[in-house]
Amino acid sequence: MSRTTETNNTRPKLPVGKILTRTIKMLWEFYPVLLPIALLGAVIQAIMQSLPSVFLERILSIISNFIDSGDWSSAEGLVFQNVALLATFYVIGLLANIISTQGMAIVTQGALQKWRSKMFSHMQDLPIRYFDTHLNGDIMSYYTNDIDAMRQMIGTSLPNLLFTSVVIIAVVFIMFYYSALMAMVVLFGFSLMGLATKNLGGKSAKNFVKTQKTTADVEGHIQEMMNGEKVVKVFSHEAETIESFDKINDELMVVARNANLYANTLMPILNNLGNIMYVVVAVVSGVFITLNIQNVSLSGLPFTIAVAVPFLNMTRQFSAQINQISSQINSVVMGIAGANRVFELLDEPAETEEGYVTLVNAETIDGKVQEAEYRTGYWAWKYPHSDGTVTYTPVKGDVRLFDVDFGYEPGHTVLHDISLYAKPGQKVAFVGATGAGKTTITNLLNRFYDIEDGKIRYDGININKIRKSALRRALGIVLQDVNLFTGTVLDNIRYGRLDATDEDCVKAAKLAGADDFIRRLPEGYHTMLKDNGSALSQGQRQLISIARAAVADPPVMILDEATSSIDTRTEAIVQRGMDALMYDRTTFVIAHRLSTVRNADVIVVLDHGRIIERGTHDELLAKRGTYYQLYTGAFELE
């Protein structure tokens, strides 16, 4: 029920700077016009929001001058002029905000859609080894938790941080413009807020990253338990299952609690420090004005009440922006962690393709095999040579293994010196206990894994020279664990060959013995299947799987324990379908029920990755060796 997992910790994490750079670079590639417009809108909005303090100082100065001179007529025009300018800037800021928020919404959702497409497309190019070593729940987490974390970062946090940074820069410049001494007082006070943010925010961020990883672990565990729920109930392991889930669930609770504990502690501290700074600035401003301390500024203006009031306003503004940065840190950290995992998936090495021999439709003209532009039902290997010539070799289904060694992990060989020969049309059966290497051999035939030593030839061609897509089209497979997709019965059969007509699919279903039960379904071949065809019996699902393989009409078939999980009566029905499928084509069969392989042309007995016996059923019984012991029940396959 469990599978070997290869966690992301086995791959080095990218530096934070590189992750952010790569994220922004990809956003720019996706939206080279809209992204800069949206970001420019955020910058303009920030600048517009920083200007009120300047206009407030001007208006207060004008009113102060009016009080001194008593000439309201000239002051009135200046006040309304500044108010009008301020209102204009507010309108510009509002429009910039609309452009920024709407633009970033489009960029964010569009980028996530493109990332999901890239991830899914790349996932189709990954080798089977990747899926054999990663939990389904962990893979699903890429598309849910990690993408959602990126959404928060790109759509909200990064624009807010850009906006906040511009506001802080503008406010600091304005502060120094009016009073360098007061600006340094403010910056010193807010440096304390920076220290609090660094310490508490850093601890909070680390725990948020752990929360994200542990959430993926919980999802993977739930997925695994859902897939194995029947096994849990068969062995009455409900209590142990609950205990194992509680352990990982408790871990999630602890890291999530710590993350929120630090985050919830940080914000009150920052708010109170901001309030304290406001009081400090007010007191220091009063001292400056009362003692008439000489002001040092870029403007050359004295430090008056007209400067003190906007300075207090800027202090509030500065404090609010520091709080805003602190509140976005966790979102950015989680977004970076999510982006790191997404990029790890995108950076996973794709399945290599060094083959150049392809599979083509063929026809014979004047005794020569030539490529056909239409489906002929006759296949040939197209073998291009270095001199520009092309050789067409008819596909016969001649499969040979020469001294093959293989191991899933370096230094751990599971197949030793495997040599066998399947003539065209022969039925070769693999027999042996679990772990003997039966399924591993079939994984090598279709190059889900590559051999370490030896050779495998298909119609005399080294399979390393055949393109994997062509090789797999020439190999049909019926697995014990049937996978049916959401769609009609017809769609699921057609999955074997996407250009198959409805008539081709019905013909394949009849060959597999599935036509009768399909026509009894509510909508026949157009009946919708969902949840892996859960409304069908195991035998019916298996028959559809056989029909899917039949419509592909490959010259070589692999039947991997295709009847081991169904009852004897259903097996007889399925067996008839498989017999029809195997007729006149090379077939490799793996079965736990030896009765299904009695009529095999060659039976290969495997033990710990080695061939220990081979021959026909009668020949092996006469030897009274391992096969004899298995057949008579002295040995068990499982």
Residue ranges and their predicted role:
Residues 25, 29-32, 128-129, 147-154, ...:
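An intracellular "coupling" helix at the cytosolic face of ABC transporter transmembrane type-1 domains
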Residues 33-96, 176-181, 283, 290-302:
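Transmembrane helix-loop-helix hairpins at lipid-water interfaces of multipass membrane proteins
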Residues 96, 100, 108, 144-189, ...:
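Hydrophobic alpha-helical transmembrane segments of ABC transporter permease domains
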Residues 1-49, 64-85, 100-104, 108, ...:
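Membrane-integrated ABC transporters
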Residues 72, 362-638:
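ABC-type nucleotide-binding domain
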Residues 65-67, 174-188, 262-340, 345-349, ...:
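Helix-loop-helix
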Residues 30, 34-44, 159-210, 283-303, ...:
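Transmembrane helices of ABC transporter permease
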Residues 9-16, 40, 48-64, 88-136, ...:
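Juxtamembrane helix-loop junctions of ABC transporter transmembrane domains
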